[in-house]
Amino acid sequence: QNCQCDTTIYCCSQHGYCGNSYDYCGPGCQAGPCWDPCEGDGTLTVSDIVTQEFWDGIASQAAANCPGKSFYTRSNFLEAVSAYPGFGTKCTDEDRKREIAAYFAHVTHETGHLCYIEERDGHANNYCQESQQYPCNPNKEYFGRGPMQLSWNYNYIDAGKELHFDGLNDPDIVGRDPIISFKTSLWFWIRKGVQYVILDPNQGFGATIRIINGGQECDGHNTAQMMARVGYYQEYCAQLGVSPGNNLPC
């Protein structure tokens, strides 16, 4: 779905429909007068916050023979970020730092400090939820790949439409092309409303876990995994010199 409306007046929702309510202008809004959950105008850029030193501090904790060593690089990340100018650039400088700390907390947890490109034992899981709108290619697998471990056929298809790759027939590209791989993590972050909840002063890091893996980790299901994410978030907030805010667990 792509919005065919006047985006000077209407918001284009994450599902490609036009309107002016929270459902259209809130989390995942693609174009138009999208609602910002916060106010303020910082000046820091993503590359100001994600220094090479910050990057190396994460990547250096993974083994030297990790498949992600030459795949997950700061330059590849920054190239992907240029396709999503709204990432890490909203609200105050403190908000920007918190958003980036949250993003890398999840990336560190999902990839083992930028080590794994593909989900370990991913072949053992079936990530096909077939429908008329979202078919599956029986010869392909839709397990986790990339910094945010993109999973499920419908996410591959939707990300592919926005990022111009064939998510149905070539999901493997997310494990092959580092720029596309990073872009899928940013697609998920923004389109699924993760960015919105970390910037919303009434929510917080716990709400980001709920979107990314809430069914597996929140409400007492896997507290150790959930608290590992919280720990990384607190660590990166401390490195960036910003308070982590409230509502950290889920």
From Swiss-Prot:
Q: Which SUPFAM superfamilies match?
A: Lysozyme-like, Plant lectins/antimicrobial peptides
* List of catalytic residues: E110 (proton donor)
Q: What does the record give as EC number?
A: 3.2.1.14
InterPro entries (UniProt xref): Chitin-bd_1, Chitin-binding_1_CS, Endochitinase-like_sf, Glyco_hydro_19, Glyco_hydro_19_cat, Lysozyme-like_dom_sf
Catalytic reaction equation(s): Random endo-hydrolysis of N-acetyl-beta-D-glucosaminide (1->4)-beta-linkages in chitin and chitodextrins
Return one Gene Ontology term, BP aspect: cell wall macromolecule catabolic process
Q: Which GO terms describe its molecular function?
A: chitin binding; endochitinase activity
First and last residue of the signal peptide = none
Pfam families attached to this UniProt entry:
Glyco_hydro_19
Instruction: Write out the coiled-coil annotation as residue ranges.
Output: none
PROSITE patterns to which the protein is assigned, alphabetical? CHIT_BIND_I_1 (PS00026), CHIT_BIND_I_2 (PS50941), CHITINASE_19_1 (PS00773), CHITINASE_19_2 (PS00774)
The protein's UniProt keywords, in alphabetical order, are: Carbohydrate metabolism, Chitin degradation, Chitin-binding, Disulfide bond, Glycosidase, Hydrolase, Plant defense, Polysaccharide degradation, Pyrrolidone carboxylic acid
Limits of the Chitin-binding type-1 domain? 1-36
Q: List the disulfide bonds.
A: C3-C12, C5-C18, C11-C25, C29-C34, C66-C115, C128-C136, C218-C250
Q: Using the record's annotations, give every residue carrying the modification Pyrrolidone carboxylic acid.
A: Q1
Per the entry, what this protein does is:
Defense against chitin-containing fungal pathogens.
Similarity comment: Belongs to the glycosyl hydrolase 19 family. Chitinase class I subfamily.
What is the protein name stated in its UniProt record? Acidic endochitinase
